[in-house]
UniProtKB/Swiss-Prot annotation:
Role, per record: Catalyzes the decarboxylative condensation of pimeloyl-[acyl-carrier protein] and L-alanine to produce 8-amino-7-oxononanoate (AON), [acyl-carrier protein], and carbon dioxide.
Binding site for substrate: 18, 118, 337
Keyword Amino-acid biosynthesis on entry: no
Subunit structure: Homodimer.
One BP term from GO: biotin biosynthetic process
Disulfide links within the chain: none
Keywords: Biotin biosynthesis, Pyridoxal phosphate, Transferase
MF (Gene Ontology): 8-amino-7-oxononanoate synthase activity; pyridoxal phosphate binding
Protein name: Putative 8-amino-7-oxononanoate synthase
Cofactor: pyridoxal 5'-phosphate
Gene: bioF
Reactions listed under catalytic activity: 6-carboxyhexanoyl-[ACP] + L-alanine + H(+) = (8S)-8-amino-7-oxononanoate + holo-[ACP] + CO2
Record bears the keyword Transferase: yes
Length: 373
């Protein structure tokens, strides 16, 4: 297996080597637990209650015997939360994308995908065998110009975008995209993994858009909702279709009931506490005040994803490792997660952070960045 050694050597030489880190005695400043619900007492208590009632796992796929009242109740809650008719659960965001996209388009169809979409979208498009065209990030003029010239060549067209982009934190213009879809008869697939609970209920709610039959809303339970798994929301017709066609749903064991119960409780907490989003914005501003003290090159779009741009892969890894020595973990994000030369430290805001935590972050940055140009 010499080839594996050689490939790993190449990865290390390019400063792209990855490894898992046990975060013991370290403060995490890059998790996706944006609202701090992962350890919320009510979420944990509800999960434990259902764990004792229903057991550890679901025991089967949804289409065999792994579909319980807890799955259905979560689906109903998600559909209501997203303003759609229906919903279906998936084992993860990756499984949702690689299962749903190939069910919607195939050979003879066209996918138009934003260049910064998540890797699971890229793989879902590959599996679909539809023709793919990647458009420049949020360049909707390019997108529309292509459709003007080429829409009639294809049977079905699916436009795909993250709503909040996972590595930059900026927001897609869903108003513009819905206008394009209506004018050129396209479906719109929005990935709301980092959107649900961070800018409101979701992108449609944020932009004041009523759900239409051509809009497919995908999201995860594992970010702001603090749980695990994913979902797709849409019309009842669409969901019935996915239950019959999405292979990653059909051939996967369903989520544990306790996970579903915890996610449902998290949504209820968000609904009961609308100011959580406002508190998150305040936490983001506190982080920005720290970053400003060090004249760092960062991006901020009023979402909890605040990447510190370093650009050079080797330097990004060095800063990450130095921060880790100080007890602060901010992951170095490099190619292929982001384009080459766009390496960054993916700092995120969370309601978990106390004033003491942010002071700790500030002191660590001061030590590590001292003397850096």
């Amino acid at each position: 297996m010499r080839w594996i050694e050689e490939e790993l050597k190449r990865i290390k030489e390019a400063n792209l080597y990855r490894e898992r880190i046990l975060l013991e005695g370290v403060k995490d400043f890059c998790s996706n637990d944006y609202l701090g619900l992962r350890k919320h007492p009510e979420v944990v208590e509800e999960s434990i209650r259902v764990l004792k009632e229903a057991g550890l796992g679901s025991g089967a796929s949804q289409l065999v015997s792994g579909y319980t009242k807890h799955h259905r109740e979560l689906e109903e809650k998600l559909a209501e939360f997203k303003g759609t008719e229906s919903c279906v659960l998936f084992g993860s965001g990756f499984l949702a994308n690689v299962g749903t996209i190939p069910a919607l388009v195939e050979e003879g169809d066209l996918v138009l995908s934003d260049e910064l979409n998540h890797a699971s979208i890229i793989d879902g498009v590959r599996l679909s065998k539809a023709q793919k065209r990647v458009f420049k990030h949020k360049d909707y003029e390019e997108l529309e110009e292509f459709l003007k010239k080429n829409r009639k060549k294809f049977r079905r067209v699916l436009i795909i975008t993250d709503t909040v982009f996972s590595m930059d934190g900026d927001v897609a213009d869903l108003k513009r995209l819905t206008q394009i879809c209506e004018e050129y008869d396209c479906m719109l697939y929005i990935d709301e993994a980092h959107t649900t609970g961070t800018i409101g209920k979701g992108g449609l709610d944020y932009f004041g858009i009523e759900h239409k039959e051509y809009i497919i809303v995908m999201g995860t339970l594992s970010k702001a909702l603090g749980s695990y798994g994913a979902f797709v929301c849409g019309t009842k017709l669409l969901i019935d279709y996915l239950v019959n066609k999405a292979r990653s749903l059909i051939f996967s064991t369903s989520l544990p009931p306790s996970v579903c119960a915890g996610a449902k409780k998290a949504i209820e907490i968000i609904e009961e506490n609308p100011k959580l989003i406002e508190f998150l914005r305040k936490k983001e501003k506190e982080i920005l005040e720290i970053l400003e003290q060090f004249s760092l090159d960062y991006k901020y779009y009023s979402t909890p994803i605040i990447p510190i741009m370093v650009y050079d892969e080797k330097e990004t890894v060095r800063i990450k490792e130095e921060l880790l020595k100080e007890g602060v973990f901010i992951q170095a994000i490099r190619y292929p997660t982001v384009p080459k030369g766009k390496a960054r430290l993916r700092l995120t805001a969370s309601l978990n952070y106390t004033r003491k935590d942010l002071e700790f972050l500030k002191n660590a940055l001061e030590k590590v960045l001292k003397g850096r140009a």
